[in-house]
Amino acid sequence: MSNNIEHTMQFDLSKNKEALTKTILTEVYNSLQEKGYNPINQLVGYLISGDPTYITNYNGARALVRKLERDDILEEVIKSYLEIK
């Protein structure tokens, strides 16, 4: 922490959001796969429709994915796909 009180400190939540999104999507993906679903198809169905029943309740996956806003998920997926940081 700086001793200079003339400057405003900034707090960046974007790294936390990125890490949280990745963690939750990985857990949801694994739960869907363990239950025998195609995780990509199920996640796409959820992201397009907003219907949480595309996500299994197994391991609390549905509750986990609902902690994230769909637009935040899409933002992180697109940034990852395009390798934008």
UniProtKB/Swiss-Prot annotation:
Per the UniProt record, the lineage of the source organism begins with: Bacteria, Bacillati, Bacillota, Clostridia, Eubacteriales
Task: Please give the superkingdom of this protein's source.
Answer: Bacteria
Whose protein is this, by species? Clostridium beijerinckii (strain ATCC 51743 / NCIMB 8052)
Q: Which family does it belong to?
A: Belongs to the UPF0297 family.
User: What is the official name of this protein in its record?
Assistant: UPF0297 protein Cbei_1105
List, alphabetically, the InterPro entries matched. Answer: IreB (IPR009309)
